């Protein structure tokens, strides 16, 4: 496991641990981000096309972001059937309340997106990119399915440098770990595995370079308050 790839055995174990977070996912995520996660999700929505657009969320999890996305044709992809089963009623009930069409839920991996070239007006990934088993391959697939000129927006933990990374690890390992242990009621809680993926996650700059390497233009990275997350953006070239 390194900043680009996760081995197949590790990835399968990671998926099992992610599925174990479903009952308390939002509660612990809100605690881990000091209540900022909803603000970050709003920032992503503001960066994506908002009218008559077709948007793909890669790694939708239990639907925490998708439930508040409105005015667009939304497709949610996740490798976990259990995540999709949790997300579908949650998201589509909100869509029905707003008089919108249901979201399309698709099981699949970022590295093998089951969509045709130039299919989407925008893509996003929130707290999922870190868990892709091959980030470079996944970004290559994202740029393939985007329409020319369309944008990808990614949110995941910030790691400005080694010192910042150590502080982030301490936060995840000690503070969030203690809270997760209380909420989950077990010592061997699934957030231990998520801390492991944070350790091997690269720096903010690593993924700027990676996005540029696979062909994205106008790539930017913004570390957002309180220094716990990064928002990466990039556009597919017009031609």
Protein language model regions, located:
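A short acidic, Gly/Pro-enriched loop at the edge of an enzyme's catalytic core
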Residues: 111-123
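C-terminal alpha-helical "lid/dimerization" subdomain adjacent to the S-adenosyl-L-methionine
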Residues: 8-12, 155-210, 220
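Class I SAM-dependent methyltransferase SAM/SAH-binding core
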Residues: 56-112
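A short SAM/SAH-binding and catalytic strip from SAM-dependent methyltransferases
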Residues: 121-134
